């Protein structure tokens, strides 16, 4: 193996793209800030039992584990920042009994990629709200998610909605055990209605519940899905409440193209209610995903309502505006010492100044000029 080779699905970010990413990150955090979201920076590595909440089984498969040479305990390299933010809200910010609005933008590392086209080191950015159970909180986060997409040239963005509360209400009413619910959840993702029908028939469920589960994979499409669902699903208060929340989101974004899928349930995840995602043209998967995950902080001692979204900022590469390198002022190597004060003054003003050693350099080909002493004063002389 060549010493310069990197592991599969791991890549360097070179200067052109690095400038784009850093600019996008700054814009994103500024957007979050003016909406009241405070930046947190959790550590890249924690004790494994803190990272693996046992709520999201899939997270354990993504998390790289190592042994801490200091304590002998098992450490994990984070694969998702949300459990860390839940820990911060539950423990470090527990003095605030009201709403905590938090945001982040940092790298995570996956033991295996989510797909052939996905990287194992995403730059995960997101925003989360803790302490507010009302649907207005979800609407605020969805609005912020859609605004985040405008940092890049995404074109028309599709908002996709689901609600795991409908499936769970039906599961409880039909008295499914945990194993049956997990099996049915997995089948729902494939939208294989025949297999779903065969499974509920094998379990000999009551006809009303068997019909409802068989119907869920067919309830997808535009806003009209909600009225269809109201007329065909069992009249359960939890189902009606979930449909009401979906309707509230649709009403909040009248000009947005919306797709509703009542069998979009995200197997092996920590979400508990409304699910939302943003899709854009030419992306093989959702650009951003979010949803409600009430109670996640309970693993850390304080269960609270929570909703939020995240995305891989590196996936924006190719859609971000070009950030040209700042033209540099050159100073001859033999003049560097004498011109030191003038050089530092220019740098404090934000001007890039590079010492020219006469052997070529990787500065912008478009130079701002050269620092020369004219009439006893160091001045930038244009070429």
UniProtKB/Swiss-Prot annotation:
Protein name: ATP phosphoribosyltransferase regulatory subunit
The protein's annotated pathway: Amino-acid biosynthesis; L-histidine biosynthesis; L-histidine from 5-phospho-alpha-D-ribose 1-diphosphate: step 1/9
Subcellular location: Cytoplasm
Role according to the record: Required for the first step of histidine biosynthesis. May allow the feedback regulation of ATP phosphoribosyltransferase activity by histidine.
Natural source organism: Neisseria meningitidis serogroup A / serotype 4A (strain DSM 15465 / Z2491)
InterPro entries to which the protein is assigned, alphabetical: aa-tRNA-synth_II/BPL/LPL, HisRS-like_core, HisRS/HisZ, HisZ
A cellular-component GO term for this protein: cytoplasm
Additional record remark: This function is generally fulfilled by the C-terminal part of HisG, which is missing in some bacteria such as this one.
Pfam families: tRNA-synt_His
Annotated PANTHER family: HISTIDINE--TRNA LIGASE, MITOCHONDRIAL-RELATED (PTHR43707:SF1), HISTIDYL-TRNA SYNTHETASE (PTHR43707)
Quaternary state and interactors: Heteromultimer composed of HisG and HisZ subunits.
Family in the record: Belongs to the class-II aminoacyl-tRNA synthetase family. HisZ subfamily.
Keyword terms: Amino-acid biosynthesis, Cytoplasm, Histidine biosynthesis
Superkingdom in the source lineage: Bacteria
Record-level Gene Ontology MF annotations: histidine-tRNA ligase activity
One Gene Ontology term from the biological process aspect of the record: L-histidine biosynthetic process
